[in-house]
């Protein structure tokens, strides 16, 4: 328990704590979902309800191909392209405007370096969009056409059909898809390592650097000397395995519940 609540990480003094990597992992994954879920929902709704038939398949394939891009490409793009642009043009504006808001302004404080917790979460959000959007699209397609056509026949708009027909019918699968994206974000290594800053510190400001479990393992496992140092890194890996396993197991159970419900309806 002391390992989980200790924020110190000092290999020289042989003092190790998992609080900072756990904090960085959970915060970046949360930011990724805040960014990725609305965009994924919009993409899935467009592909299933609004997109012309001749464009539906090409756009769907394009979204799925984005999931195949190696994570190191996202990380290098984030470090060499996005981070400098973000530090020069967006971060100062966010610090001046959002940082002045009482309460939540503390979240938008930090050095305008372009790398940090917020940037890592943003890159993760871009990475999980193809996964969540693909699952949501497949889930929306299992809604019986008769239900949607009946709603349209009563004069409902597209948004009303999605809100009152599609989402209630597929809410279990939607949550499962979101948790599947969360599992992807929790276990991401290379993209986060490039842009999170790799500093063992906890700060309220999202623009400050921090660290994640996967980044700690990638950066330090090869150079770990001493039994205690190696044991701390292995325990970090076990913590990440447990968190990811629970999230992915819950998502699979929710998707199985959706399929079981679909079978009962048919």
Cite the ranges covered by each PLM segment:
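Transmembrane alpha-helices
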Residues: 65, 69, 132-144, 152, ...
């Amino acid at each position: 328990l002391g390992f989980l609540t200790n924020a110190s990480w000092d290999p020289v003094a042989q003092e190790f704590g998992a609080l900072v990597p756990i904090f960085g992992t959970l915060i970046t994954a949360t930011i990724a979902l805040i960014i990725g879920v609305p965009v994924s929902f919009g993409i899935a709704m467009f592909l299933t309800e609004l997109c012309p038939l001749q464009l539906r398949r090409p756009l769907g394939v394009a979204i799925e191909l984005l999931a195949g891009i190696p994570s190191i490409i996202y990380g290098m793009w984030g470090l060499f392209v996005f981070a400098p642009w973000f530090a020069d043009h967006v971060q100062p504006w966010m610090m001046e405007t959002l940082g002045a808001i009482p309460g939540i302004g503390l979240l938008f404080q930090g050095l305008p370096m372009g790398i940090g917790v917020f940037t890592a979460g943003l890159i993760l959000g871009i990475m999980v969009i193809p996964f969540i959007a693909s699952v949501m699209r497949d889930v929306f397609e299992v809604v019986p056409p008769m239900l949607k056509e009946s709603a349209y026949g009563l004069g409902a708009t597209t948004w009303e059909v999605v809100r009152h027909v599609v989402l209630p019918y597929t809410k279990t699968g939607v949550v499962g898809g979101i948790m599947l994206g969360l599992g992807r974000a929790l276990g991401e290594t290379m993209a986060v390592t490039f842009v999170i800053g790799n500093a063992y510190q906890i700060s309220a400001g999202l623009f400050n650097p921090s660290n994640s479990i996967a980044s700690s393992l990638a950066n330090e496992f090869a150079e770990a000397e001493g039994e205690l140092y190696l044991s701390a890194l292995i325990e970090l890996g076990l913590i990440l395995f447990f968190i990811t396993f629970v999230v992915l197991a819950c998502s699979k159970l929710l998707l199985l519940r959706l399929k079981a419900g679909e079978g009962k309806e048919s």
